[in-house]
Amino acid sequence: METTKKLFALLCLFVTMNQAISVSDPDDMETFCMKSSRNTTSNTTYNKNLNTLLSTLSNQSSFANYYNLTTGLASDTVHGMFLCTGDVNRTTCNACVKNATIEIAKNCTNHREAIIYNVDCMVRYSDKFFLTTLETNPSYWWSSNDLIPKSFGKFGQRLSDKMGEVIVRSSLLSSSFTPYYLMDTTRFDNLYDLESIVQCTPDLDPRNCTTCLKLALQELTECCGNQVWAFIYTPNCMVSFDTYNSSLPPLPPPSRSGSFSHRGNNKLLGGMVLAVSVSVFAFLSLV
């Protein structure tokens, strides 16, 4: 009987923790609804323009991995964009943007500015013109809970050096089919490869793209430089790295099963998954 009670409590613990770390389910999306002195209501012209804009973004994601537009006039003007990562196909891009537009509309009701991140895409809208302007907040990162093996030596420095090279090369790709997107794979150990990916929104000039990527890389290496993989999004760029054993079959893309955190408001989620794991282990030891 006592064991049954403990198992029931454990089940409740799992449910509670799952709710605690859930962020904009169902698609692992993180939404930022910006505070504003001029919030809106559901029946305003601005909101109608916003709904039109989000619908257009969703539709256009079937044809491109980046799109921006402006709709409305004067104080009812809405600016918006989406960006899909350069390694996803049209079907994945469309699915991500479609879900993101639904989530951002649901989570940021009556907000005049918002942004939503997912590992495959981001969607943004605002009543202020933001294209061509470099912004670094809010940022959001995911990372593995697994640490780099000690046998890798000074991995953090090697990671910074390699990512720095990739950033310089990506700044030369402003006119490519997928502007500023670059993926590089380098053997850095007898068995392990380092995969580096960077990308900027195409509206940035090369100088601002480089600045955005360098700042994102700095934040990523500070938080996650010893992790097996990590990924960061900012409003204008993304940086990711992954290490894997090239002699083994490829693993599926990283999901948000590791730690995650963001910068730009008062919320902080980093390390929660690790805390969950420790708590569950401690509880199991009592059963």
Swiss-Prot record:
Primary subcellular site in the record, as a coarse category: membrane
Key word Hydrolase present: no
Pfam families found in the cross-reference section: Stress-antifung
Entry's transmembrane regions: 268-286
Keyword terms: Glycoprotein, Membrane, Repeat, Signal, Transmembrane, Transmembrane helix
Assigned GO CC terms: plasma membrane
Annotated compartments: Membrane
Extent of the signal sequence: 1-20
Coiled-coil portions: none
Similarity comment: family membership: Belongs to the cysteine-rich repeat secretory protein family.
Topology class, membrane: Single-pass type I membrane protein
Name of this chain's protein: Cysteine-rich repeat secretory protein 58
Domain (Gnk2-homologous) ranges: 28-130, 135-246
Sugar-modified residues: N39, N43, N59, N68, N89, N99, N107, N208, N245
Residues in the Extracellular compartment per record: 21-267
Topological domains annotated Cytoplasmic: 287
InterPro entries found in the cross-reference section: GNK2, GNK2_sf
Native source organism of the sequence: Arabidopsis thaliana
